[in-house]
């Protein structure tokens, strides 16, 4: 066992310590939250060792196998894959979880079950790391389902609220649709290749692989909230803000994109799958950016921005640039977690008020939080030399300089400019102008449990992109040369978005619409998607069930087939078998004929 394996397993072992100590009774202690936070910090420091060694030894991949079980011809192993993706993702996920857990100690301090909450967060992180380090599909599936069930428990944490329960069920049901795709792919690989080991699958690489790859795309669409399976992501905002921060930054929502990054050796020569992922990502990034434009819940706006960025990652997968997609996963995690923590600080200080129309003037009341929020919004838009710029700019450059679908490229560029629009809208409504909250509201951000995590993520949102982009192995993403006007495309689209936002703000300050426009309704009602998909199918199902119950069961079986048919059969039988039918005239006629014949016979002379 070498250094990579030992330190990776040590990281996972450190994280499982608070879980294993649950039965000792220490989890009821008031210091349990601080203990869990420190454990995650220790795991973060430990995970830095293999990451640094990997970057300085120029190794490609290291795989550790332990035989687990043999089922007929299938050999299952406990297999850990230490490559660029897993070794770089682990420190990022642990750093962000460490910050979120410290923030949770402030945000959830009055919750009676806060220790259980921390345990759930830790399990959420562990299952994500299992997924990231897995080298076979069975192990990956354990992590995949683990993040799914933990998201259900965390989104529905406030189980006394109906909306939270509905959102948790929605998340689990949409993810079950994606799980069908993953299970179908696993079944195909098992029946056709007799293996779930990733390296063997890549070596065999049969053609065509459209069916299993479409299953993987469906799985990624469910887990990473692509268009069609996206409504659960904004609904997940019903959970506590630390859950939203962890869910949307470095864990569950990027699991689908990470799955496709893992399987890129199978996808890189399959044009059909690349086109599907490109178009799906382009539609997602534009649709969710449009939906974010008119939302008034600050967490919903940030949630839709997450979905839009996931669409951009899917576009990058479609461009056959998995390393750029992974870079955007890591950089996006920093500023997205910080945006959620800043929104949580504002919501907590304003007594759980999430409507940006009831905020305003917070720049002076919460100077540190609002500064971090502005930098996070600028990083989200891809402002030069912030973290988002180092991943977003190369993605736009790769899209504009590749032989790709111009339609998908246009949608992506429009969505990029809209990112600047809704980011500016958050700044205008929440931070600037006159205060629109009650004057008696007590506002205080001077708490180290609040300031320190945001401060760490703020540093990450400024410098992490530079560090991560310089750590990409040079043999995977070659340097691109392009004309100056293409090089400036991403910056031009962001600038255009800012200009549009400022112009709209200036033009509509004193403008009142009697009736909302159709485009406003489309954006506010989320493209009518929840209305149609969450109401029409249940309505049709209930209507069909009612028709089946009344027409088929009640009228046909319980009325026509059983009672009426039985009565009719009995009537026919009694009619046929009865001697007396009540026909008086016929009886008299038969008597007459009988008497007449008798008289004729008796009176006939011999």
Curated annotation (Swiss-Prot):
Its main location: mitochondrion. Keywords: Electron transport, Membrane, Mitochondrion, Mitochondrion inner membrane, NAD, Respiratory chain, Translocase, Transmembrane, Transmembrane helix, Transport, Ubiquinone. Its EC number is 7.1.1.2. It is found in: Mitochondrion inner membrane. It holds the Pfam family Proton_antipo_N. Belongs to the complex I subunit 5 family. Core subunit of respiratory chain NADH dehydrogenase (Complex I) which is composed of 45 different subunits. This is NADH-ubiquinone oxidoreductase chain 5.
